[in-house]
């Protein structure tokens, strides 16, 4: 007997259990991709599979819907593989050990992969049904979303007919996501030369800041340790030996430290006075500045340019949305500051839900790098999914939601990247919405999928397709 037998929606959860038996971590998607191809072959549906393991399956419209616009059902095949220390599952060859109680489906000791296996399961159930009413369908299953949306980036979309996209990769029932940020990782490099130390060496820094995620928490008034330290050093008679802070471009750094050389006898007092002027937000009650003697053999010629650049670069929220209240529209975060043998590097996470603002901010960083004798490089650029003031899909999904739930859904945008951004960039005129059933603690071994929510969301999907 199958573990999920008897639960509703039966068809979708049956496919979900089958998918969970197939290893499908990021970069290990060949088997699950091949399963989707076999599914299509067995039902006489047209299909495509590319070298990245992305799969497209097409199904004709149900009777009476032949002249309706094609709808894309989209989700990703890969999952995040995390497990408890005492769990002996080998994600490369073992399926998940599904369990459920009256409320949730979960896996024993591992992530569940509801993100985004339930999307694939919903789509397969729609493709398998001969009873549902729907327009022509293109089910698009991408790979390696969890490690940078690599599958969507590699997908040839030139053959896609659909310009209406249902992305089922959200984890909060009742929320319709209609826009996301685009972004890039920007690196500013300032060359330096090492010369013998002249003066006394000190270790100075700031620690104990709150930190946080630069997408979700950039608007919560949290100080960036790299910017705080640069401000505390501004105007002091110091030469850098090294400076470093943060380890991820998308995390607001909590601590930053420099080794400096100074001929001033009272540098500790001067640094303390500068630090006292730091306009730290009220959220930073545990910030601690320090200045203590250190050892150093070399200092950096050219450190004036480094400190000048650090104090000149923008950071944090740059613009708020005029369409969606409370949404950060454009921001950047100086997440990583490092000193190498011949250069100091500033690494930023740049985000904006308006593509022209993202590129404008990048141009500003390029100009500042050049002004201070540095260079600019970039990686991981991805497009924004811009908010559409007029969206028939959004209107239909709001109406169907109100009819089913008796209340309005929350319509929101997020200050982070989604595959919808790549699809909207490649498919002109795309009308897209992201939604999904309720999940908790995704990407952890505590991940669980709400059974009742999964049933409601299935009913919602079916009703939306009938209206499109």
What are these regions (language model features)?
Residues 158, 221-236, 264, 304-311, ...:
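His/Asp/Glu-rich mid-to-C-terminal helical/loop segments that flank catalytic regions of hydrolases
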Residues 77-79, 140-148, 169-173, 210, ...:
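Acidic, glycine-rich active-site loops and adjacent beta-strand->loop/helix elements
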Residues 101-106, 146-147, 152-351:
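Midchain, well-structured core segments that form catalytic/ion-binding scaffolds
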Residues 65-163, 185, 198-201, 315-316, ...:
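Active-site metal-coordination/substrate-binding segment of hydrolases
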Residues 222-244, 387-430:
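Active-site-adjacent substrate-binding region
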């Amino acid at each position: 007997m199958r573990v999920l037998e008897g639960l509703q929606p039966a068809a979708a959860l049956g496919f979900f259990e089958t998918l969970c038996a197939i290893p499908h971590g990021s970069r290990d998607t060949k088997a699950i991709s091949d399963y989707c191809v076999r599914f299509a072959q067995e039902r006489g549906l047209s299909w495509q599979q590319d070298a990245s393991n992305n799969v497209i399956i097409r199904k004709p419209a149900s009777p009476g819907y032949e002249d309706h616009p094609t709808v894309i059902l989209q989700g990703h095949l890969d999952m995040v593989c995390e497990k408890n220390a005492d769990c002996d599952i080998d994600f490369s060859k073992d399926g998940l050990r599904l369990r459920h109680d009256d409320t949730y489906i979960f896996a024993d000791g591992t992530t569940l992969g509801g993100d985004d296996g339930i999307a694939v399961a919903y789509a397969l159930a729609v493709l398998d049904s001969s009873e549902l009413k729907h327009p022509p369908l293109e089910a698009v299953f991408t790979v390696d979303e969890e490690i940078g949306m690599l599958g969507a980036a590699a997908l040839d979309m030139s053959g896609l007919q659909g310009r209406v996209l249902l992305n089922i990769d959200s984890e909060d029932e009742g929320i319709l996501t209609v826009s996301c940020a685009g972004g890039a990782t920007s690196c500013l490099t300032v060359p330096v030369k090492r010369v013998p130390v002249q003066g006394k060496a000190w270790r100075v820094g700031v620690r104990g800041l709150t930190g946080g995620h630069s997408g979700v928490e950039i608007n919560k008034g949290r100080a960036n340790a790299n910017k705080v330290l640069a401000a505390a050093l501004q105007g002091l008679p110091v030469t850098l030996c090294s400076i470093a802070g943060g380890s991820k471009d998308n995390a607001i750094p909590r601590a930053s430290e420099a080794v400096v050389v100074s001929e001033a006898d009272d540098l500790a007092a001067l640094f303390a006075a500068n630090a006292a002027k730091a306009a730290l937000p009220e959220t930073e009650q545990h910030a601690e500045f320090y200045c203590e003697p250190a050892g150093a053999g070399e200092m950096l010629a050219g450190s004036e340019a480094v400190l000048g650049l650090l104090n000149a670069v923008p950071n944090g929220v740059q613009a708020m949305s005029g369409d969606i209240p409370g949404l950060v529209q454009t921001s950047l975060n100086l997440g990583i500051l490092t000193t190498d043998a011949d250069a100091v590097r500033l690494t930023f996470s740049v985000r904006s839900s308006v593509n022209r603002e993202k590129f404008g901010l990048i141009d500003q960083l390029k100009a500042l790098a050049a002004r201070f004798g540095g260079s600019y490089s970039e990686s991981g650029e991805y497009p924004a999914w811009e908010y559409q003031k007029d969206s028939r899909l959004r209107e239909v999904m709001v109406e169907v939601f109100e009819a089913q739930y008796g209340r309005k859904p929350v319509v929101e945008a997020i200050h982070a990247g989604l595959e919808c951004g790549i699809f909207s960039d490649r498919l002109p005129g795309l009308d897209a919405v992201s939604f999904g059933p309720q999940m908790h603690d995704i990407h952890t071994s505590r991940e669980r999928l709400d059974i009742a929510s999964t049933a409601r969301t299935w009913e919602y999907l079916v009703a939306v397709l009938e209206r499109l």
